[in-house]
Amino acid sequence: MAGQKIRIRLKSYDHEVIDQSAKKIVETVTNAGATVVGPVPLPTEKNVYCVIRSPHKYKDSREHFEMRTHKRLIDIVDPTPKAVDSLMHIDLPADVNIEIKL
């Protein structure tokens, strides 16, 4: 797989879980003999939702909720076949979204 690069994007609502997952991916791939760049923290996406507290009137009384999406980027430069195989068999939490591009 000479000259290739694998790019992994991780997304999660919990920053501790995403950091643990990124650390696990980096350890697994480096033990398999590939070079890793990252994890690079990307900007956190913050969505704010404004909801009226009362179902009927009192429109001035509102409540704000926010949802933060944390993102990390990991690049694997010149991956070995063993590194790709170990990457496919790694076990990560369900609340971490993983996008892998070759």
UniProtKB/Swiss-Prot annotation:
NCBIfam families: PRK00596.1, rpsJ_bact. It comes from Bifidobacterium animalis subsp. lactis (strain AD011). PROSITE patterns: RIBOSOMAL_S10. Part of the 30S ribosomal subunit. Keywords: Ribonucleoprotein, Ribosomal protein. Signal peptide: none annotated. PANTHER family: 30S RIBOSOMAL PROTEIN S10 FAMILY MEMBER. It holds the Pfam family Ribosomal_S10. GO terms for cellular component: ribonucleoprotein complex; ribosome. This is Small ribosomal subunit protein uS10. GO terms for molecular function: structural constituent of ribosome; tRNA binding. Involved in the binding of tRNA to the ribosomes. One of its GO terms (biological process) is translation. The keyword Ribonucleoprotein applies. The keyword Cytoplasm does not apply.
